[in-house]
Amino acid sequence: MSSTGELVTHGSPLPDWDVQSLPPDQWQPFYAAVLGAFHEPEPDEVTALWGSLGEPRRCLVVRERGAIMGTAGTFSFRMSIPGGRVVDTAGVSMVSVQAVGRRRGVLTALMRQQLDSLRRGGEPLAVLTASEAPIYGRFGYGMAARQLSLDIASRRVRLAAPAVGSDEVGLSVEDPHKALDACEELYGRLLPQRPGMMAHENGWELVPLLDPPAWRDGSAPVECVIARMDGRVAGYARYSVAVEWSRTNTAEGTVRVRDIEADDPRAYAALWRFILETDLTSRVIAPNRPVDEALLHMVSDVRHCTPTVLDSLYVRLVDIPRALCARTYATAIDTVLEVGDRFAPWNQGRWRLTGDGEGAVCTRTHDAPDLSLDVAALGSAYLGGVTFSELAAAGRVHAHRPGILATATAAFSSASAPWMPFAFCRSLLPRL
């Protein structure tokens, strides 16, 4: 649908409302509608940050008699994918439907208009972090990355053995804002090494610093510890501490880890030791870590590191051949995929994928399929964190020749589990 407010005609006629592009001067009512749909107040500094990050030209609204009934936004990201490339990716967010618009096709119309726009714009991938998990599968999004939440009894856990040379790591607690450039330089080096990470650009580097008092829940302001080796920044951790006292006047504080990164295992071990040994605390909560978190192989007693695995990043292939050619493959693959995609018919059909560690070619074909799946399942497999074998076990992928599941699983695999370090869904911003 064009930005002129012309009626959307996909599916049944809907004469009472239409989908429009957001006029540049309408950000405030648009965002107010988003807040209303999420049923929660928001600190002024959070609203201000979203105002600076928002891209009104990429936002859509559904209006009925002038009132906003539905919203959808898109952020311009660059995401790391298997092979180390960082590619243009549409970050879908601020999707909402007011109560009066439910069961009337509003969400479907927004998703339809948005996907058509993404295709015209040339982004091969769209991603989102869902506030409600069941919503987006019917629009072609598949769960591609999970996150690990750790609840650690820190008085019962120590690093099993210091990493060799860890005593050579220098630690210093620094102001998070003043240390931002150093942290971002390190993050940029790590970005290509793990699929699913977004480049911190256009103000997104400020999201980890977001720390409104109303969201602290008794914690002190966020702090930052920097790890240095041989005069360079080798790691950092941002965290907050909430100290509580028991009835026996014993300190039972909690360290809440916002993020912790390092490019050297010695620096990583030193940072975790610092966190685990924080005075006046007995608990460490790390709500968003990769599922292949190295800490679990460092600690003396993993049973006191209680894990919870959650869904995180959902991936949608907007343009199948461009998306599959953007990444590389861990082992050689030559296969025909039969992909179902009713919501994006340009993706529907059979595709021959030939690829290896250097690159890939993906073209339409009439050859018999080796694998049949829908586009959401392909999105789940894209970053290498969900295998074709497990999707087949769930009935999401069907193999038509022996051995192809093992071949596809190996080819699409990633050395590091995909992970999204920060949420860009408004309701999932860090509340530590």
Please describe what each predicted stretch is.
Residues 37-81, 85, 196-224, 323-324:
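Active-site rim helix/loop that mediates acceptor-substrate recognition in acyltransferases
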Residues 1-28, 82, 164-432:
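Intrinsically disordered, low-complexity, positively biased terminal segments
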Residues 61, 67-76, 91, 96, ...:
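Conserved beta-strand in the GNAT
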Residues 94-97, 102-119, 264-276:
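Conserved acetyl-CoA-binding loop-helix of GNAT-fold acetyltransferases
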Residues 119-124, 129-150, 270, 290-307:
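Conserved active-site alpha-helix within GNAT-family acetyltransferase domains
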Residues 22-26, 34, 105:
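Hydrophobic, small-residue-rich alpha-helical packing segments that form membrane-like cores
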Residues 143-178:
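Flexible glycine-/small-residue-enriched beta->alpha junction loops
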